[in-house]
Swiss-Prot record:
Lineage: Bacteria, Thermotogati, Deinococcota, Deinococci, Deinococcales
Organism in which the protein naturally occurs: Deinococcus deserti (strain DSM 17065 / CIP 109153 / LMG 22923 / VCD115)
NCBIfam families per UniProt: tsf
CDD domains linked to this entry: UBA_EF-Ts
Protein name: Elongation factor Ts
GO MF term set: translation elongation factor activity
Amino acid sequence: MMESIKKLRELTGAGMMDVKKALSDAGNDEDKAVALLRERGIVKAAKKADREAKEGIVRFVVEGNRAAIVEVNSETDFVARNSDFQALVEKLAQTALSAKTNDVEEFRNFSMDGETVGTVVAAAAGKIGENLVLNRVAYIEGDKVAGYVHSNGKIGVLVDVAGGDETKAKDVALHVAAERPQYLSRDEVNQDDIEKEREILTNKALNEGKPQQIVEKIVSGQIGKFYEEKVLPEQRYVKDNSMTVGQYLGDASVKRFVRFEIGA
């Protein structure tokens, strides 16, 4: 019980007594307890517990209509800023372009300098003196491909834009880095999650004393806002919030995007 209380306090930021009561009312079901806390207005949204931040950098390579991106973690920011480490990550990105994979385990076994990628990373770790982890890799091939790295390599993005030019592709990559979209369209959103969210928001509004006849309107507005925050074409465009990303793109469309962020 105490372990669950500690976990939910970290997860929601709620007080001990509120968490304890929610767990009791939920029959010690942690997910149900989080939903109860939200319905009671004690927390605004379920959020993940803070995790120890990983250091490292993200690098990408674009060649024509192909691109690859990698994330490599280090123990300290000092190593992340080390020129040897940065050169390694850049070479890994170039190698990923040849590997054409989105599977990090497959990439670790890919050939590089007569060794496997995993062996090369392990050797670099021994030389640098820190544990290095090849965390993620992605490869895209499409129409107009562009990339963007932000915040000293802490965030990296690749996008594939169909029907657009290089400027639009680069602008969308910058937007994705800044605004953290999660979906390309509403169709990608798990409808079970939406219904669960709708139920929580409905119960919360009713618990706040909102009249039944306006609760549905309130909840629909909040669900719409969820889509506006999470679905790329519906987000307000970062360079001009008078329009959405979809409006900025016009006849063009984003076919795929990849966003890596250190520690996320």
